Each structure stands twice: as structure tokens, then as C-alpha cells.
Amino acid sequence: MTDAARARMLETQLIARGIRDAALLDAMGRVAREAFVPAEFAAEAYADGPLPIGAGQTISQPYIVALMIEALALRPGERVLEVGAGCGYAAAVLATMGARIFAIERHAALAEAARARLAALGLAVRLRVGDGHAGWPEAAPFDAILVSAAGSAVPEALKRQLAQGGRLVIPVGPPGGQTLLRLTRRGPERFESRDFGPVSFVPLLRGVGAAG
């Protein structure tokens, strides 16, 4: 059943909406999304919408995950920082595509569960609890940065951690007015911007989440 649901998701939600990256489609066809959602939502894992994962967070709908990753324009072996790892699904897709993943999650319980899922799948992802606004400076620079929460603006620390030619994909704006942006670094202080349209994400908060 899940293989069939995954195949339908690829055809009706991704390919039908213009997702063309072959490596991305292959990875999303291989990663078991149902392993990344709470058991009570497993039957809805391939539904065309977000699902709650705890701590007030969600796993984005499959199309939005695909849109953001395709916007990164990844090449095999690139170093990628994910801010807002959540349940670990996007990190799993990125790692399956051959990227070297560094992931940050502000909620310790989500990070611990994601780490366990990724390890069980044999995926090498470095994941730590931290404030996504700060990025991961000691591991920088990154070829790509994916931010899975909406900022009021693009955090300057993340821009500084982007390699020359690197791409940063982030939703920006207030609730009800967010847009998905890609910044490509063209020089020390020069960034080229592209708008990928309206989206809706949980906010990118500062600090780490409270325990419990």
C-alpha cells in the first residue's frame, strides 16, 4: 500500500505540478515518508498537505518539500545545512540524493527522534539542537542552505555561511504573506534573488525550545 501511495504522490503531486529533478524524484520515491510521521498519521503520510509532528511543528506537504529541494539545484556531494529539521524527512531526502547534511532543530525531542529515524535508515546526517538563526558556523561554508521555517527576513548569519555560488532557500514574511525565496551568492555582499511564490510555514523562532 505505501509503495503505491508513494508512486501516486510522485505522479499526482510532484510531476503533475512541474517537479522535474530526476535525483529528487528518485529519492522521494525511496524514502518512506510514513516513517517520519506519528503512528496515528501514518495512513495520511502521502496526503497532499502538512501533518503535525509534535512541539507545535509540522511536516510540510510533499510538493512543498520537493519545490524547496529542487530550488536548491543540488549537485552530488554538496554540503547542505538544513535549518528546522523537524522529523528529519527533508534531511533524509537530501542525504538519499547524495548530499552531505548538517541539520539543526530547536526542539530536543524532535531532534532526538529524527536522529534515531535517520540512523535506522543508515543515513549519515549530522544533527544538533540549536538556534537556526545562528546556523552552524564551524561547519561553514555550505553549498546550499534550506530553511524549513519562515523568517521575517533572511538571517544575516546564514547568508555569511553560504559559499560563493551557494544557494539559500527560505520562506520569508508574516503569516498569510510568506513567499519562498532563493538567494544565490554572487559575491561577498552580492546576492541574486528569485521568488518561487506564496507558501505557508511555521515561524523561524530564536533560541531553543523548552524541554517537555
Curated annotation (Swiss-Prot):
The keyword Signal does not apply. It catalyses: [protein]-L-isoaspartate + S-adenosyl-L-methionine = [protein]-L-isoaspartate alpha-methyl ester + S-adenosyl-L-homocysteine. Pfam families: PCMT. Belongs to the methyltransferase superfamily. L-isoaspartyl/D-aspartyl protein methyltransferase family. Coiled coil: none annotated. Catalyzes the methyl esterification of L-isoaspartyl residues in peptides and proteins that result from spontaneous decomposition of normal L-aspartyl and L-asparaginyl residues. It plays a role in the repair and/or degradation of damaged proteins. It comes from Methylorubrum populi (strain ATCC BAA-705 / NCIMB 13946 / BJ001). InterPro entries: PCMT, SAM-dependent_MTases_sf. This is Protein-L-isoaspartate O-methyltransferase. Keywords: Cytoplasm, Methyltransferase, S-adenosyl-L-methionine, Transferase. One of its GO terms (cellular component) is cytoplasm. It is found in: Cytoplasm. The keyword Isomerase does not apply. It comes from the Bacteria. PROSITE patterns: PCMT (PS01279). PANTHER family: PROTEIN-L-ISOASPARTATE O-METHYLTRANSFERASE, PROTEIN-L-ISOASPARTATE(D-ASPARTATE) O-METHYLTRANSFERASE. GO terms for biological process: methylation; protein modification process; protein repair. The active site is at 60. Its EC number is 2.1.1.77. It is an enzyme of class 2 (transferase). One of its GO terms (molecular function) is protein-L-isoaspartate (D-aspartate) O-methyltransferase activity.
